[in-house]
């Protein structure tokens, strides 16, 4: 089963650091987004590539699906991705529990440096895939 998830970036009206300290905020969605395309593969691996706006990879990694051990990577962001996947598994213990594997391709149509939510859209897409809120 192949799946596609899409999450729009956001404009945070008040300062992000105030929100992190508990302040209320208003955000509005933008036309910019990140997609997550999941394709089933036969191998029991998770192969992940995330592309930025210029179609350059910013995350490239292969994980052992049984324990999410990083088998190969070229990017330090892979540790953040592993943390997200492990957190999703803690909430939904059936997430990624399969005899087959996955090839995941993430793409965004905005610059990561714009502050529109490259991390938050990735988190939201993984949450949708894991069927968690």
Regions found by a protein language model. Give the residues of each.
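ATP-binding N-lobe of GHMP and related small-molecule kinases
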Residues: 1-114, 132
């Amino acid at each position: 089963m192949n799946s596609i998830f899409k999450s729009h970036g956001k404009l945070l009206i008040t300062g992000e650091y105030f929100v992190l300290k508990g302040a209320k905020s208003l955000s509005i969605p933008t036309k910019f987004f990140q997609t997550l395309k999941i394709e089933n593969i036969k191998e029991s691996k998770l192969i992940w590539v995330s592309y930025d706006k210029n179609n350059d990879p910013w995350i490239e990694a292969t994980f052992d699906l049984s324990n999410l051990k990083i088998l190969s990577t070229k990017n330090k962001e892979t540790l953040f991705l592993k943390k997200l996947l492990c957190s999703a598994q803690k909430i939904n213990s059936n997430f990624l529990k399969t005899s087959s594997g996955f090839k995941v391709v993430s793409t965004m149509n905005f610059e990561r440096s714009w502050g529109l939510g490259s991390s938050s859209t990735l988190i939201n897409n993984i949450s949708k895939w894991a069927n968690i809120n």
